[in-house]
Structures are given as structure tokens and as C-alpha cells.
């Protein structure tokens, strides 16, 4: 399992830099902005993570720019021909779109895992 920190709708994977002897992280999935943080202790790391996001949101407010989101709500999924065919047939049987079928499947998976 990976180490993930979450705050105000943003998340980052945490790693340890042996070279710098500190914990570090970067908010992934932003196309135009870079938010990184670090700390020598977990407490420092958490504080710097929250401060980095708060600073980013404050900067966006001051510059009247919209903060980027890590997930836009759409993605491309490569299912392979066989799984795609089965999903399409099942969506037709249920009288729903294939998109709705995949959303239901992901929601069901997340609920049980």
C-alpha cells in the first residue's frame, strides 16, 4: 500500500529521499501548476503539505485564477476487445450507457475494497 496524504480535495504520494534525508511529496495530476512539499519529520511533512495547498489556493484567489483539480471526471479506459464487448452487451441488457455501467462497477468495487 502506498502512503497518501489528503487535504482540501488534493492528495499526494509521499516518498523518502535518502539523499536529502527527508520526506517529500508532490501533488500529482496538475497540468500547469506544481505543488511540492517536504519535512524532516512526519509532523513537519504534514504541516508543509497543508501550507503548500493553502498557499496555492490563496495565490489562485489573489490572481483570480481557478485552482486546478487533479481529476476532471473523465478518463479513457482500455478494456481490451473481449471485456469491452461483454460490457457493451451488459449495458444494452440493462438499458444503460456503457459509461454508466463502468461508473457502477467502479463504485461497487470502491465500496467493497
How should each PLM-predicted stretch be described?
Residues 15, 38, 76-78:
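Generic structural detector for well-ordered beta-strands
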Residues 41-55:
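A short, charged, amphipathic alpha-helix used as a generic interaction element across diverse proteins
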Residues 62-78, 82, 92-94, 100:
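Short Lys/Arg-rich basic patches
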Residues 98-113:
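Short, basic amphipathic alpha-helical segments that act as recognition/interaction helices
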Amino acid at each position: 500500500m502506498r502512503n497518501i496524504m489528503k487535504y482540501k480535495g488534493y492528495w499526494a504520494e509521499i516518498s523518502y529521499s535518502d539523499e536529502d534525508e527527508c520526506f517529500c511529496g508532490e501533488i500529482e495530476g496538475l497540468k500547469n501548476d506544481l505543488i511540492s512539499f517536504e519535512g524532516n519529520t512526519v509532523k513537519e511533512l504534514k504541516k508543509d503539505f497543508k501550507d503548500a495547498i493553502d498557499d496555492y489556493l490563496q495565490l489562485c484567489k489573489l490572481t483570480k485564477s481557478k485552482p486546478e483539480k487533479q481529476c476532471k471526471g473523465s478518463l479513457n479506459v482500455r478494456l481490451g476487445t473481449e471485456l469491452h464487448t461483454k460490457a457493451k452487451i451488459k449495458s444494452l441488457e440493462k438499458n444503460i450507457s456503457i459509461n454508466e455501467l463502468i461508473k457502477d462497477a467502479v463504485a461497487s468495487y470502491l465500496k467493497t475494497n
